[in-house]
């Protein structure tokens, strides 16, 4: 997952991180 985050733009990485966090919380 880290690889994808690093490759993707910063704003995109933030969105993905937020989505992942939401799923984890759920």
UniProtKB/Swiss-Prot annotation:
Q: Does the keyword Lipoprotein apply?
A: no
Tell me what this protein is used for.
Nanomolar concentrations inhibit biofilm formation in situ, in S.aureus and in P.aeruginosa, suggesting it might be useful controlling bacterial infections.
For the region Important for localization, give the residue spans: 3-9
State the conditions that upregulate or repress this gene. Expressed during sporulation and is regulated by the mother cell-specific transcription factors sigma E and SpoIIID. There is a lag-phase of approximately 2 hours between the onset of transcription and translation. The 5' untranslated region negatively influences its own translation.
Look up the record and give one Gene Ontology term from the biological process aspect. sporulation resulting in formation of a cellular spore
The reported effect of residue 8 to A is: Strongly impairs sporulation, but does not affect localization
CC per GO annotation: membrane
Predominant place of localization:
membrane
Which cysteines share a disulfide bond? none
Keywords, ordered alphabetically: Membrane, Sporulation
Coiled-coil intervals: none
Q: What is the effect of changing residue 12 to A?
A: Strongly impairs sporulation, but does not affect localization
Q: Does the keyword Membrane apply?
A: yes
Signal peptide as annotated in the record: none
Q: Where in the cell is it found?
A: Forespore outer membrane
The written remark on domains in the entry is: Residues in the N-terminal region are required for proper localization.
More details: Preferentially localizes to slightly convex membranes. This preferential adsorption is accurately modeled as a two-step 'dash-and-recruit' mechanism: first, an initial binding event occurs with a faster on rate, then cooperative recruitment of additional SpoVM molecules follows.
What exactly does this protein do? Coordinates cortex and coat assembly during sporulation. Associates with the spore coat protein SpoIVA and with the outer forespore membrane, thereby serving as a membrane anchor that tethers SpoIVA and the entire spore coat to the forespore surface. May also serve as a competitive inhibitor of FtsH activity during sporulation.
Q: What is this protein called?
A: Stage V sporulation protein M
Q: What is the lineage of its organism?
A: Bacteria, Bacillati, Bacillota, Bacilli, Bacillales
Q: Write the gene name.
A: spoVM
